[in-house]
């Protein structure tokens, strides 16, 4: 069963994803994917996890763009979700994709080494 904070997190995920694609014109924000949102039980804070295609420069640039868009996004969340208090937004780069890719790469290397030993 979903509690209120999980429902709000899901709504924020959909809304922020849409706003970034359609509503933001900041050139610093590159090809970004929102991977998850966690909201505190009191709905006062939301952590938005994201990934960015590109190098470290693209990641830094996107982080700056998101930081400057926080007020706009928070205002839109409050308006569109009709919350008494719009949560304070925190953006955090999601390293799980990179971590998974690294594990996959290591497993392939092990498999290649086993194949050459036979």
Curated annotation (Swiss-Prot):
Keywords: Cytoplasm, Ribosome biogenesis. Gene3D superfamilies: 3.30.300.20. The keyword Metal-binding does not apply. GO terms for molecular function: ribosomal small subunit binding. GO terms for cellular component: cytosol. Pfam families: RBFA. The keyword NADP does not apply. GO terms for biological process: maturation of SSU-rRNA; ribosome biogenesis. HAMAP family: RbfA. Monomer. Binds 30S ribosomal subunits, but not 50S ribosomal subunits or 70S ribosomes. PANTHER family: RIBOSOME-BINDING FACTOR A, CHLOROPLASTIC-RELATED. One of several proteins that assist in the late maturation steps of the functional core of the 30S ribosomal subunit. Associates with free 30S ribosomal subunits (but not with 30S subunits that are part of 70S ribosomes or polysomes). Required for efficient processing of 16S rRNA. May interact with the 5'-terminal helix region of 16S rRNA. Belongs to the RbfA family. This is Ribosome-binding factor A.
């Amino acid at each position: 069963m979903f509690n209120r904070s999980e429902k709000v997190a899901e709504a924020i995920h959909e809304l922020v994803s849409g706003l970034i694609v359609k509503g933001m014109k900041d050139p610093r924000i590159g090809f970004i994917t929102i991977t998850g949102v966690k909201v505190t039980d009191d709905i006062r804070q939301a952590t938005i996890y994201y990934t960015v295609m590109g190098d470290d420069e693209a990641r830094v640039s996107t982080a700056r763009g998101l930081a400057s868009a926080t007020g706009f996004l928070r205002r839109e969340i409050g308006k569109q979700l009709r919350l008494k208090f719009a949560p304070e937004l925190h953006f955090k780069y999601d390293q799980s994709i990179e971590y998974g890719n690294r594990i996959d790469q290591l497993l392939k290397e092990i498999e290649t080494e086993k194949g050459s030993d036979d």
